[in-house]
From Swiss-Prot:
Biased composition (Basic and acidic residues): 201-218, 238-250
Source species: Oryza sativa subsp. japonica
Zn finger intervals (C3H1-type): 519-547, 557-585
Domain of life: Eukaryota
Region (Disordered): 198-218, 238-261, 375-403
Name recorded for this polypeptide: Putative zinc finger CCCH domain-containing protein 57
Keywords: DNA-binding, Metal-binding, Repeat, Zinc, Zinc-finger
Biased composition (Low complexity): 389-403
GO molecular function term, any single one: DNA binding
InterPro entries listed in its UniProt record: ZFP36-like, Znf_CCCH, Znf_CCCH_sf
Length: 605
């Protein structure tokens, strides 16, 4: 009974948004973000997708939609070259539907209440746990695909095996399968065979017997991830020696000797991060002195809290290739840590969040990587996207771009942005993305490359750029200026006149008599407040800064009587535009906040 109570208390922990499982995993998250942020193709933020969806719901289920989304996307992307169909395009309605299903599934998963595991253990073990098992396998496959794609981008020209064939065979062969609880098996004819064939001159794909023989010799020992072994000579003799050495180390370790099975780059990461990876089959202890052991879902007694003097990311990775390899290794270790969801003492819901976010982010990044790998050149990362590529590079600036610097409007139907990050959000504004990473799309701001089907509606707040006429447009002089606070609407869409039919002078005089024209620069420009950019430029009648804002004298009775709607507690529809007194609005200048609505005003007051 006490054990069940303790388990219930552990599972009842609310991880919140973007939570991590332990200090080591948190450290690796920081390393991933730091390393990938310095690479031209990056995730920008691992958990951005999780921050942009609803936090809690009351339902359990619909994880199948996310699994189908990941399975179908990965299969369609790589199956096209095998005749299985066309890859899913970023602008296809099918991908949009899958993304919506994934968002729904993510909200449902985030809505899983921790105490339901204790209340309904049968439902959890029969329904949820198998689905989590599948999700973890898919995340590992996506990670293998991601590593292969990154390796492909750095592949030198002139090798015996073409980079595209190498990546295709690598992704198709790196098929992770779980057997039991702590065993991971990789399909035969793995990536190390392809690398060996490139160095030993076995270019022909028909030499299957030789490759299979060498593969068996390699796989007799423990599998070593040669994807990350950059400078390793993979000739036939060295592979045999390596297999014998690894078998001897494994036997010595089982007998309690000093033998050690460790990947050299994994060891390098451990030293740089000051962290320890404790996998399901083996334990990597770091060779520095650390504090007392802390809790880990995989091996509670074998993990160490990082030393305080250690940096959270490698500081001596100067070139892009080293950073890519280190980032891939950090991702690989993170997925290994996520296997702790099978541990009864692990905080299941924190790991579940990480697995889903990582899998979704990996799929989105792989979509971008495919755009580069489909090009003819594989020497370096392309500086400029090719024709038809949905991202366009903007000239780099030092630091953040200051408000008021105009964006260059893209061509019809195009995208605009650095390509540094991915917009997961379907609407609104991201708070953590720097200004220079904003992306413009014909479908409206905030849609991102995943949601290009929306139409630009025009008007204020409907798109990233408003449809106000430019100063050189003939219709610019025919715009109706908004009324002032004494009697009218502040914002009104411009009137466009077609076929040369311009109102006569008499009609203009009558219109001027019916409405009171407002002096310019007395209201803040809504476009400038939202985006830091105004298409009207210096000819805009609205103020673009507090220095330009003109304060006019109000009438004697302006805001001297209380607003009856505000007194009734119902809120005022006019907000700051109301002519009557509303608490703090009495006798204030006629400055209008374009974001403050009546509903927000009611909440504030």
């Amino acid at each position: 009974m006490a054990d069940m109570k303790q388990e219930e208390d552990e599972l009842a922990v609310d991880p919140g948004v973007g939570a991590v499982c332990d200090p080591v995993t948190k450290l690796r998250f920081e390393a991933i973000v730091c390393l990938l942020d310095r690479i031209p193709i990056t995730l920008q933020q691992i958990d951005m997708f999780g921050q942009d969806v609803a936090f809690r719901t009351k339902r359990i289920g619909n994880i199948e939609a996310l699994l189908d989304f990941l399975k179908g996307s990965a299969a369609a992307t790589w199956g096209a070259r095998a005749g299985a169909g066309e890859p899913i395009d970023a602008s296809s309605p099918e991908l949009h539907r899958l993304v919506e299903d994934a968002e729904t599934a993510y909200r449902d998963v985030r809505g899983l209440q921790p105490r339901m595991v204790v209340q309904m253990p049968r439902v959890f073990h029969k329904v949820c746990l198998p689905k989590l098992h599948q999700l973890l396998v898919i995340a590992r496959r996506l990670l293998a695909q991601n590593v292969a794609l990154r390796r492909l981008l750095l592949q030198p020209v002139g090798c015996d095996v073409s980079p595209m064939a190498l990546a295709e065979a690598a992704v198709s062969s790196d098929d992770f399968e779980r057997h039991g609880r702590n065993k991971v098996v990789i399909d035969e004819f793995g990536y190390e065979d392809l690398l060996r064939r490139r160095h030993t001159g076995h270019e022909s794909q028909n030499d299957a017997d030789d490759a299979e023989q060498h593969g068996r010799e390699v796989r007799e020992g423990e599998y070593e991830d040669l994807i990350l072994m950059r400078h390793r000579d993979t000739s036939h003799e060295l592979l045999q020696d390596d297999a014998r050495r690894r078998r001897a180390d494994a036997e010595a370790e089982q007998q309690g000797g000093d033998g050690e099975v460790r990947d050299e780059y994994e060891d390098y990461l451990c030293r740089q991060l000051g962290a320890v990876y404790s996998g399901p089959d083996q334990i990597y202890e770091h060779d520095m002195r650390g504090p007392e052991p802390a809790h880990s879902p995989n091996t509670p007694d074998q993990i160490y809290v990082p030393c305080e003097r250690m940096l959270p990311y490698p500081s001596n990775c100067d070139n892009a290739e080293d950073r890519i390899h280190m980032a891939c290794l950090a991702l690989k270790n993170l997925v290994k840590d996520m296997e702790g969801i099978y541990s009864p003492r692990g905080t299941l819901w924190q790991y579940l969040e990480d697995v889903i976010s990582l899998a979704h982010a990996l799929f989105l990044e792989n979509t971008k990587l495919h755009r580069f790998t489909d090009q003819a050149s594989h020497q370096d990362l392309p500086l400029q996207p090719p024709q038809g590529f949905p991202f366009q590079q903007q000239p780099q600036h030092d630091g953040y771009q200051q408000p008021g610097v105009p964006f260059q409007q893209p061509q019809q139907g195009g995208y605009y942005g650095h390509g540094q990050g991915i917009m997961f959000q379907r609407g609104g504004y991201l708070q953590d993305v720097p200004f220079q990473h904003w992306q413009w799309q014909q479908g409206g701001y905030g849609q991102g490359f995943m949601f290009p089907q929306a139409q630009h509606q025009g008007g204020y707040g409907q798109g990233f750029l408003s449809e106000q006429p430019l100063p050189g447009d003939p219709s610019f002089m025919n715009m109706q200026a908004p009324y002032d606070g004494d009697g009218g609407v502040l914002f009104q869409k411009p009137q466009h006149y077609h076929h040369g039919h311009v109102p006569s002078e008499k009609g203009a005089i009558q219109a001027k008599g019916k409405q009171k024209m407002r002096e310019p620069k007395t209201v803040m420009c809504p476009d400038w407040c939202r985006t830091g950019h105004c298409s009207s430029g210096d000819g805009c009648e609205y103020a673009h800064s507090q220095d330009e804002l003109r304060v006019i004298d109000a009438r004697p009775k302006y805001r001297t009587e209380p607003c009856r709607y505000w007194l009734a507690g119902k809120g005022c529809w006019y907000g700051d535009k109301c002519r009557y007194k509303q608490h703090r609005l009495a006798r204030e200048p006629l400055y209008v906040d374009p974001f403050l609505t009546g509903h927000e005003l009611r909440n504030k007051t």
